[in-house]
């Protein structure tokens, strides 16, 4: 009888700790991606120093007003609409109480980091990956398929979950204000953006993906309000002009 009680207590502890284990695993995966990126950047920097090459800091040379008039691609629209199911899946996963004792499963496919996003205002420093699969959104930021490449004239869309853990992923994106800076770093360049537009839209409102004909726009997408996935919090920024 005593053994049975001990087993039940241990089982309860393990089940209660399950959400923490999942969050810790996601954090570990994120840190691994960041460390791998930093190591690759370090190796690349050493090679470039030998060859005389340097990373370029790119800014927008076009001072025209925004003209978000081109419709987004079908792939971009599908990626955006697909976030509804993904956010709901992740939210349900985080909201579930101790009912699940299923062990944490490692990512089935390797995830490759294509860049980093840094938002000093909210102390965010996150890996960016191609695509917006569940595996990607659980550990970092995904670039929507079909949106513009970084620095290109058009609209580059990035999405991340508003994790329940304070400061993790896009948890604090609601604190962003117009004029705040966002930096995107890739293997080849650094892109500096300034926030100019913040809004909340419905999950079906793909107008936020419209492409500028004159400027490089960055659009950040996350679920809103916190703990639900009923709407989308959108933060838009444009590539800064050269000083």
Language-model-derived ranges and their functions:
Residues 2, 8-177, 181-189, 193-243:
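Solvent-exposed, non-transmembrane regions of membrane-associated and secreted proteins
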